[in-house]
From Swiss-Prot:
Residues that coordinate or bind Mg(2+): T43, E104
Species whose genome carries this gene: Aquifex aeolicus (strain VF5)
UniProt name for this protein: tRNA threonylcarbamoyladenosine biosynthesis protein TsaE
SUPFAM superfamilies (UniProt xref): P-loop containing nucleoside triphosphate hydrolases (SSF52540)
Gene Ontology MF terms in the entry: ATP binding; metal ion binding
Binding site for ATP: E12, G39, A40, G41, K42, T43, T44
One example of a Gene Ontology biological process annotation: tRNA threonylcarbamoyladenosine modification
Subcellular location: Cytoplasm
A GO-annotated cellular component: cytoplasm
Protein's job: Required for the formation of a threonylcarbamoyl group on adenosine at position 37 (t(6)A37) in tRNAs that read codons beginning with adenine. Is involved in the transfer of the threonylcarbamoyl moiety of threonylcarbamoyl-AMP (TC-AMP) to the N6 group of A37, together with TsaD and TsaB. TsaE seems to play an indirect role in the t(6)A biosynthesis pathway, possibly in regulating the core enzymatic function of TsaD.
Family matches, as InterPro entries: P-loop_NTPase, T6A_TsaE
Length: 133
């Protein structure tokens, strides 16, 4: 994986701008892996990505911690949001190619086209490293 960019986010607006940048890179079948501790902003980023991809109701985007998988229609096909926190060995391979996958807590590099590592710097500040195949 190649480091594409490293940014500091200080607001939800910064998160949305980053999500817009990433949305422009997407063709519609990528796997985006989101890494970071609890509360780092993984779900917040997916909400911003949903908005950037023109999901009809981005405020309805919720963490799939208990459902494991949530799907949303976008201008580029489906956004499939998967959370591996409770079930790290969940096999989501059937979803690959069905849309853009945003996978929280994926620690393996193999399935990832893009990796976002989110580090908490303080209550409102995050460092994000973006890697790409």
């Amino acid at each position: 994986m190649e480091l594409l960019k490293e940014v500091i986010l200080e607001s939800e607006e910064d998160t949305y701008k980053l999500a817009e940048e990433i949305a422009q890179l997407l063709k519609g079948s990528e796997v985006i892996c989101l890494r970071g501790t609890l509360g780092a902003g993984k779900t917040t980023f997916v909400k911003a990505l949903a908005k950037a991809l023109k999901v009809k109701n981005p405020s309805a985007v919720r963490s799939p911690t208990f459902t494991l998988v949530n799907e949303y229609e976008t201008d580029k096909g489906k956004l499939i949001h998967i959370d591996l926190y409770r079930v790290p060995d969940f096999d989501y391979s059937e979803f690959i190619g069905e849309g853009i996958l945003a996978v929280e807590w994926e620690e393996r590099d193999k399935p990832c086209d893009i990796i976002l590592e989110i580090e908490i710097l303080d209550e409102n500040k995050r460092k994000v490293r973006i890697y790409r195949k």
